[in-house]
Amino acid sequence: MPSIILPPKPTALQKPHINLAVVGHVDNGKSTLVGRLLYETGYVDEKALKEIEEMAKKIGKEDFAFAWILDRFKEERERGVTIEATHVGFETNKLFITIIDLPGHRDFVKNMIVGASQADAALFVISARPGEFEAAIGPQGQGREHLFLIRTLGVQQIVVAVNKMDVVNYDQKRYEQVKAEVSKLLKLLGYDPSKIHFIPVSAIKGDNIKTKSSNTPWYTGPTLLEVFDSFQPPQRPVDKPLRMPIQDVFTITGAGTVVVGRVETGVLKVGDRVVIVPPAKVGDVRSIETHHMKLEQAQPGDNIGVNVRGIAKEDVKRGDVLGKPDNVPTVAEEIVARIVVLWHPTAIGPGYAPVMHIHTATVPVQITELVSKLDPRTGQAVEQKPQFIKQGDVAIVKIKPLKPVVAEKFSDFPPLGRFALRDMGRTIAAGQILEVKPAQVQIK
């Protein structure tokens, strides 16, 4: 049976490439909207979709068909039908867009942190349905948490889809109310809401996604796909040393070890000698593949599978980083970072031990010292060696990883210099690395 989501067409790979994070609260319609986007851009297998629609009809849940596209794709992936990590993509007139980390994953917020560090742009999905909207941006709302995260991770390009407009009868007043509240939140985070597109959509009915809807005559702006076309692809840092955080590793019979990840900086070519750290194992690149197509070389932004000779699967794990022996990725003994405390019930002091999520790695860490507290607006120090910091504070801190992990200065390698601290199932803080004290690494 064909995969429900089609691989990129040859035309797609000629276009500039953008990684899109789809964020928002549970049940606000992210999966349905992604399914709809894939369908509208010709990336859903018609035969497989018909099967799904018939199944949905049988149980009286026709509205579920688009969301089920992703469910079906996830099942295929779990059964090993598709290798691609968690990436699906679609094409607009000007761009090829990869959706990173599909919504609905139980570790979505955690993945958001690792995933969004790869995002060039974000689609924020918010439901106009009374009750759902308020829950999403309330103090406990995931919608709110996701916006804080994409801000901290440096995502500048955002579009807001005000979804489920069909449920509120395409009421302009409700749309304006949602827009005003979300704008307030965006402003608080330092975005300029006047530069962000808000679009009234219905993922289920298809309003304003590919074509202008007659149901919203009061809306004169662009469609969702038109806004995507206005996104600027990032400058890809090809001239920096190679860094590729590893997302996954597996063995293919007859081929050997394959590591999957996204090239963040530098260039990787077939035949290159590479090193994977912290384990400090050296190997050679046999082949590189992206979306089932062979590549001679990979550049920043490429999501790839790399067949490595000389390195065993058990020597490598998610969170390790692939580089070159002449510029080995830095394993951190200690880091100095600027953090913002997003949520904490009491206060944080020296000795606090959360879990750090950095690129694709997850490690236990300890805050060893609070160096200074900063004024969030100016970035100037207002207090040296504070005893504690609390929610809303910005501070410079020293952090010691309790297990080996690769970490780089944010100014050198942004994707490897951004992190989140988590505890109690919540994101406590997000930060940027200012200094790294390197650990000794013996290349084997």
Swiss-Prot record:
Reaction catalysed by this enzyme: GTP + H2O = GDP + phosphate + H(+)
Region (G5): 202-204
GO CC annotation, single: cytoplasm
Region entry G3, spans: 101-104
Gene3D superfamilies named among the record's database cross-references: P-loop containing nucleotide triphosphate hydrolases, Translation factors
EC number: 3.6.5.3
Protein name as catalogued: Elongation factor 1-alpha
Gene designation per UniProt: tuf
